[in-house]
């Protein structure tokens, strides 16, 4: 989705700006698919379908938190890395470094999003 792409673009641009300054790094993570209550307001028929399919493709909410926890706490994490589950389609599994979309690596888009973010918020990010 656009919001996920924007998150990655901003993270990569932030890391590019932080790199010359030293130890602070910017990383990103995604949970894969987690069995949560997000489907509680969908029609009952769909809820039943989710209950059948979910164990096959999703992990627990605790499992979904692991990529973020690793990105935030593992001393081996490097700036600009992106963490997600190692399973098929990055849906579930152990947290590992994963690739993001080709578009997320577009430096021009990263810089443009940074500039638009500053413009729309009226804040110049001191990085």
Residue ranges and their predicted role:
Residues 1-127:
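NAD(P)H-dependent oxidoreductase Rossmann-fold/reductase module
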């Amino acid at each position: 989705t656009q919001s996920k792409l924007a998150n990655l673009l901003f993270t990569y641009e932030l890391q590019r700006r932080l790199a010359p300054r030293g130890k602070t790094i910017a990383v990103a993570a995604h949970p894969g698919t987690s069995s949560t209550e997000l489907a509680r307001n969908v029609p009952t028929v769909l809820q039943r379908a989710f209950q059948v399919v979910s164990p096959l493709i999703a992990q627990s909410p605790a499992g979904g938190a692991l990529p973020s926890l690793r990105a935030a706490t593992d001393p081996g994490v490097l700036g600009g890395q992106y963490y997600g589950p190692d399973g098929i389609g990055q849906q579930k599994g152990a947290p590992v470094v994963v690739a993001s979309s080709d578009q997320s690596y577009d430096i021009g888009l990263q810089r443009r999003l940074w500039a638009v973010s500053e413009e729309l918020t009226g804040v110049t990010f001191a990085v």
